[in-house]
From Swiss-Prot:
Protein name (database record): Holo-[acyl-carrier-protein] synthase
Gene assigned in the entry: acpS
Family, as annotated: Belongs to the P-Pant transferase superfamily. AcpS family.
Binding locations of Mg(2+): D8, E59
Enzyme class: transferase
Amino acid sequence: MLIGVGTDIVQIPRIEKILHLYPELFAKKILASKELKQFALLGKINHAAFLAKRFAAKEAVSKAFGVGIGQGINFKDITILNNDLGKPIVEVSSNYTNTLSPFNIHLSLADDYPVCVAFAVIESSYNVILG
């Protein structure tokens, strides 16, 4: 059963400006601990694109849940990692998911300066009603 679909587009220059003003604060605000470790390993030239993709991905996932960021789910409740082939893997905090049946989140990310886009689909094998 389809639970929801979400998409988001982020202007990478917007994230560059935020990073210039708040170099550490912004990353700590939107990244979960596992993502912060990945972020620390990147060269500074890749920071804005990484953050833009994570921001867009988390917005898309929250929209697919039908709630949006700050309305039942927060940036740090969603972790975006990559498998060995680079496929995005989504982990959602048990604080949010413990009331839901098992589900799968499919996420696609793309960036081509100056934009990045995220598209999320959430599905379940059970009948679930959100909201």
